Amino acid sequence: MATIKVDVVSAEEQIFSGQAKFVALPGEAGELGILPGHTPLITRIRPGAVRIEAENGEEEFVFVAGGILEIQPGAVTVLADTAIRGKDLDEAKAEDARKRAEEALQNTGSNLEYATAQAELAYATAQLAAIQRLRKLRGQN
């Protein structure tokens, strides 16, 4: 089966680099599925889970907090604002962050504080959704 080169990088480190059969991620206008031979594209990505079906059939999961996606004829590059390997996601920390953001929304004094709290809430909610999705795909409840 044909494959495509996939790189997922953040400002801190390279999270994944290898050949893949399929990549799915949250694009700006909805979920994107990428197979080898996909039309070239550059778009923003929303916070959420990136699922990579590697050449050997194993699945890799990465949480991204947004960023840019570039698709070229032989390569997919995800430039993430922040990226966390699926196995490193911490549900308790994400839930705590969600609660803090919700509290901050109730106690904001300025538009900037409100916007910051909204962004933090969106990030935590997306991270929790990615954890739930990963758990479901692994057959755990």
Curated annotation (Swiss-Prot):
Pfam families: ATP-synt_DE, ATP-synt_DE_N. It is found in: Cell inner membrane. Gene3D superfamilies: ATP synthase delta/epsilon subunit, C-terminal domain, F0F1 ATP synthase delta/epsilon subunit, N-terminal. InterPro entries: ATP_F1_dsu/esu_C_sf, ATP_synth_F1_dsu/esu, ATP_synth_F1_dsu/esu_N, ATP_synth_F1_esu_C, ATPsynth_dsu/esu_N. SUPFAM superfamilies: Epsilon subunit of F1F0-ATP synthase C-terminal domain, Epsilon subunit of F1F0-ATP synthase N-terminal domain. One of its GO terms (cellular component) is proton-transporting ATP synthase complex. It is a peripheral membrane protein. The keyword Cell membrane applies. HAMAP family: ATP_synth_epsil_bac. Produces ATP from ADP in the presence of a proton gradient across the membrane. F-type ATPases have 2 components, CF(1) - the catalytic core - and CF(0) - the membrane proton channel. CF(1) has five subunits: alpha(3), beta(3), gamma(1), delta(1), epsilon(1). CF(0) has three main subunits: a, b and c. Belongs to the ATPase epsilon chain family. This is ATP synthase epsilon chain. It comes from Paraburkholderia phytofirmans (strain DSM 17436 / LMG 22146 / PsJN). The gene is atpC.
